[in-house]
Amino acid sequence: MEELQLQGYLEKDGSRQQNFLYPLIFQEYIYTLAHDHGLNSSIFDEPMEIVGLGYDNKSSSVLVKRLITRMYQQNSLIYSMNDFNQNRFVGHNNSFYSNFDSKMVSEGFAVIVEIPFSLRLVPSSEEIPKSQNLRSIHSIFPFLEDKLSYLNYVLDILIPYPIHLEILVQILQCWIQDVPSLHFLRLFLHEFHNWNNLITPTKSISVFSKENKRLFRILYNSYVSEYEFVFVFLRKQSYYLRSTSSRAFLERTHFYVKIEHLIDVCHNHFQKILWFFKDSFMHYVRYKGKAILASRGTYLLIKKWKCYLVNFWQYHFHFWSKPYRIHINPFSNYSFYFLGYISSVRINPSAVKNQMLENFYLVDTLTQKFDTIVPVIPLIGSLSKAKFCTILGHPISKPIWAELSDSDIIDRFGRICRNLSHYHSGSSKKQSLYRIKYILRLSCARTLARKHKSTVRNLLQRLGSGLLEEFFTEEEQVISPIFPKTTLFPLHGSHKERIWYLNIIRINDLANYLDWS
């Protein structure tokens, strides 16, 4: 019902889609949609208690109506930001700081902000229906395997957060022309933690990202989209700066002439001249806040790329990116964590015996191969954060699941185990997954024992030890989307066979915990 109301609102007039999003903030069905989205959260999310109100996180129509009434009363503040310090959006009782109000406002506003983005994506998804497999996360690894084996250096980049909140609002102006909605967003961001300083502490940004996940993802993705759009544009322009003469002096002259022409074109984006350089063997891959920039060039060239990125964030987004967030490493002796895998370029020496007439000689050859393995220690750390084990890897019970039925408990643990086996099927060393499966199996047994107020030994004697053992060691038949034939792929039978799936559209929750920790 709520989706039909929203669709009818958007179909009335095309101009209203962009210029009149603000009235949706006062519609109750928007917050119902936001609540329905929250019900589809990860199984690792814990139910939250609303501090000071005594309610759980279930949507209450009464509370939503009260929230909308308070926002109506404060409507005049949306248009007068000058008296921000004298007038408070929350009213006199500071109820806005409650978890319910802040979460519902942020989730509801995120639903509204997603409208312009979804309208742009619908036509493109209908035009290219055959590219669904490109959405798979695993499709990135065959690309890395094909390209990175021949490169020399890699930039391991942690994309910095924009410090000033006004930068995020200005970026959204390119997508949303509704001025009242932007003022409302600006007011909410500043009111959330009273961010009046130019430099916001990292801790505050971290708290905001955890308590308002959906809105934070919208803001962060819009910022990353803007950064990559400008970065890729400048990268393409620098790639076409080809020399037109064979002489070194003339090459240098023509190069700087083209540089000056490009600076005139990009003058609106930069306040200071940035030096461009040519690197035709550069590859860029990103997922969330982690990016990989690999090059076949020399150390001096990759160092220039690092300086360029630091200056890029400084002059285009007006904030300082700490240089230690960008690491330069050679592929020959470096492993980087990306998308839940520890990846590296492994050098395999081999000797070939050749014969010429009656003489034999050996030829030593070196081959480079892109390798991916399961990060056991980070996975144990993620299991520890999710309360499945201690930091040392000792299994513990999951108290919050003890109230479920036995079948639901086993199903949840089994689903986690199967998802891990499925997601890490591209590892060349799958034996390390046995330890993770052991932790989950024993944690499941202890959770069942906690529910029945018994010990693990007595529980297994009563229910039978073969129940969990048979469930967690079940072999699966896996059809590889890369190889033309169907193969049997038991987890314990093929330790070095790597299979990438084309139906995985999101990173595993345990690996996701590590990326955002």
From Swiss-Prot:
Record's keyword annotation contains Isomerase: no
Compartments in which it is found: Plastid, Chloroplast
GO biological process: mRNA processing; RNA splicing; tRNA processing
Keyword set includes Plastid: yes
Top-level taxon: Eukaryota
UniProt keyword list: Chloroplast, mRNA processing, Plastid, RNA-binding, tRNA processing
GO cellular component entries: chloroplast
InterPro entries in the record: Domain_X (IPR024937), Maturase_MatK (IPR002866), Maturase_MatK_N (IPR024942)
GO molecular function: RNA binding
Pfam families, per the entry: Intron_maturas2, MatK_N
Role summary: Usually encoded in the trnK tRNA gene intron. Probably assists in splicing its own and other chloroplast group II introns.
Record family assignment: Belongs to the intron maturase 2 family. MatK subfamily.
Protein name: Maturase K
Native organism taxonomy: Eukaryota, Viridiplantae, Streptophyta, Embryophyta, Tracheophyta
